[in-house]
């Protein structure tokens, strides 16, 4: 969605989108394709498209995505977030999505903490470096950090996952749920 907003506002050229990623995105968007296929194909294109962009542009389009698309979350997911918050659970988003989007979603849903892939900026310009959070190794490191920070008992914890990168996270908790 963020990539599409960058195209809509003429921040990046739509030619790259149509030549490289549109069909894979449409398959995933209709839930007919695999998210990992979409992620692999678009990740490099997305990162290359952001190189040299001012953080203000990225923040503006991110805000538009949250404003217009943040309710496009599965009903089940929303109900589980609400249930956990209503029961005073610590709720943490660990996502491979860009951290600047994950933070905005976490704020919208009033969760305890979050982490996403870290996109690095130099002098307010994206420099092309991404510290990923979509793989099992990165997610395990994040989990370890949150366990220490919040004194979490993983045997009593829940995890929800929808990608291959979530498998080890699901194995680590007492209440794993694959979506």
Which residues make up each language-model segment?
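A metal-dependent, Asp-based hydrolase signature
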Residues: 7-83
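C-terminal cap/substrate-recognition subdomain and adjoining C-terminal extension
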Residues: 60-61, 67-179
